[in-house]
């Protein structure tokens, strides 16, 4: 169901942030690295962006929060 997918996805994101913290990376640096990775994929014209526009949408979301 949609709720189960949302729950699993949010758990993956949560655990990624917590693992990063345990490895000495602060949350802000994780966000910054994520934005840099998205920008690089935009420059490299990643297929997911061509097909769906997901990368630019995600970058806008991250910048706006």
What are these regions (language model features)?
Residues 1-9, 13-65:
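Flexible "arm" and connector segments at domain edges
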């Amino acid at each position: 169901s949609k709720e189960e997918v949302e729950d699993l996805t949010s758990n993956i994101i949560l655990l990624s942030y917590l693992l990063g913290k345990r490895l000495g990376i602060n949350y802000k640096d994780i966000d910054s690295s994520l934005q840099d990775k998205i920008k690089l994929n935009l420059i490299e014209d990643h297929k997911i962006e061509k097909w769906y526009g997901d990368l630019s949408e995600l970058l806008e979301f991250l910048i706006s929060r």
